[in-house]
Amino acid sequence: MFIGRRYFLKISAQAALCSVFPVTAIASMGRLSAPKRNLFLFNTHTGEKLDVCYYAKGRYQSEALEEINNIFRDYRTGEIRPIRKELLNLLHSISKKLDQPTRFHVISGYRSSETNAELRKKSKYVAKNSLHIQGEAVDIRIPDYDTRWLRKVCVTLNAGGVGYYRKSDFVHVDVGPVRHWQI
């Protein structure tokens, strides 16, 4: 049986459309059923608390991100910058790894260049080009968790930098290259 060129093109186009739309529908359904991502944050310097769903129905929630940026702000200058979503996802992964809702005490989130320079004058452990300046790092502690143990949990995620600051009793996590250190 001979099939004409026009008939072949028509059938091919219909097959292509049938194959595209179900995939799009399935992709949308997957996004809508994606689990919510929540964070509970407490800024140790300002006393502010935030319990927020920052990701729902496959999308980041812009109002929630603004609230998070505010909690992570440089408390010394009041300067606010966007915090990388990858960092929020890392905190969420830590919470999931602990297998329970986690209250993160935020010791240092975003830092202005000026604040970072001042801290460098006081401590040799503050990096000149700290990822805090980019909104890509946070120093945390979790109530009732030993920070040594928290450090180990963070290292197992293999998702960026992890620093343990024993004397100051906090763990630094960032979304830079995978590495870890103790001070």
Spans of features found by a protein language model:
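Sec/Tat-exported extracytoplasmic proteins
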Residues: I94-L98, T102, E114, D144, ...
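Active-site acidic/histidine clusters and adjacent loop/turn architecture
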Residues: R59-H105
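Charged, often glycine-rich, active-site loop that binds/positions anionic groups
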Residues: E114-K128
